[in-house]
Amino acid sequence: MESLTAVVLAAGQGTRMKSQWPKVLHKVCGVPMAEQVIRTVKKAGSEKCVVVTGFKEELVRERLAGENIYFVHQEEQLGTAHAVMQAVPLFKDNRDGYVLVVCGDTPLLRQETIEGLVCACRDHDGAAAVLTAIMDNPFGYGRVLRDAKGHMISIVEQKDGTPDQLAVHEINTGTYVFKTGALLDSLEKVDNKNAQGEYYLTDVFEILIKAGRKVIPVAAEDASETMGVNSRIQLAEADRILRIRKAEDLMAAGVTITDPYSTYIEQDVEVGQDTVILPGTMLQGKTKVGKNCTLGPDTQLTDVICGDGNHLNRVYAHSCELGDNNEIGPFVHLRPETCLHNDIKIGNFVEVKNSDVDDGTKLPHLIYCGDSDLGKNVNFGCGTVTVNFDGKNKHRCTIDEHAFIGCNTNLVAPVHVGARAFTAAGSTITKDVPAKALAVGRAKQLNIENWVKEDTYKD
């Protein structure tokens, strides 16, 4: 099979986005648009991907760099043909191969659609193939013109078309496949004699047709996947479509999502079978969720590794790891570098940061546990705080297995509580507690008799 090189057009600023960032780096479903396009073309068989940069190229290069990805710079944006010309040195030596040209702001394109376009060009001995779509409102798009037999004649841009031509509803999507040799020969003949004064890549098709070469129009089954993103409104629409696709893929794989329209799951998230995701849940980044979990409602996980059988209710977690069969929430904050093992209970209004919590430990309510190592079956009473910051440095607490920490205990780090030790409620612990000992760190209660001289409360 002949090689396929993808050219991703990513040079534009995208002024309608009203942003300091390149348009193609705005995210849809957690992934920059151009990266989403690159992933799709690679899955469709592209062996080499050439990204044409322009506005803030250093940011685009930094974010999109990867294996078999190459960058060329378009100093002036003089049209789509001019953009492709910048990439010619990277595919000119393989005239028998194919070149896929795709816009970096079309993140909804499916792998199957691109594969179909490539096959149409290859199987019908085409010099090129054009992905088209039927639009109810085609304003702003180039129109695909056909003859009486349905063969493609040319593509005319909105600003160059006659009223009859602009009445056509079949539009050019900006995604093309070319036989490499045919593209190279035709690019040399493209000029900028048009209303915009630009070098249109679409002129290549007219050149090929006049030379008696085949240009194959292929209509997309779903016109929405060809949508280009040019504004924040279109960005939100693209995000919505990809989010629903992701939810449908997960449901088809055995995940229950009770309301996909109120659930946000990004592209790179993985979820195991028989997990139930309740409304208001957001799964972001590289989050991985195991089997038989219940997530939500109103739970947000970002870059979290979550094992099997976990129940998370109104949990906010970031860059942490959970084992199996943990009960977390409601109203729990799990901060980075936290590792919860198995069968752990973390209840109302608890915050855990940079801590390792072993099997069976309970932090039921109103607790701050930071920079700490907790052994198995430790119990933290209500109101316990690990006092980990001295104003300059952070220090760790170590609490060994089966220790019982009484309510409203302050553990002033660095401190070590031994196995099966107790702390009395209300204590401030500043020294290590031996195993099986009871630590009392509070003032002795003093009752002052006759404190009230006369009864000020009357019936």
Predicted regions: what is each one?
Residues 1-19:
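N-terminal nucleotide-binding beta1-loop-alpha1 segment
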Residues 1-3, 31-104, 108-119, 123:
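Conserved N-terminal catalytic core of the sugar/cofactor nucleotidyltransferase
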Residues 2, 169-272:
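Conserved alpha/beta core of the MobA/IspD/sugar-nucleotide pyrophosphorylase nucleotidyltransferase superfamily
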Residues 4-5, 48, 88, 97, ...:
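Catalytic cores of nucleotide-enabled group-transfer and carboxylate-activating enzymes in metabolic
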Residues 20-36:
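Short catalytic helix/loop segments, enriched in acidic residues and glycine
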Residues 58, 67, 109-195, 202:
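Conserved core of the sugar-phosphate nucleotidyltransferase
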Residues 266-338:
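Acidic, glycine-rich loop-and-beta core segments that form the ion-binding/anion-interacting portion
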Residues 311-459:
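Glycine-rich hexapeptide-repeat left-handed beta-helix
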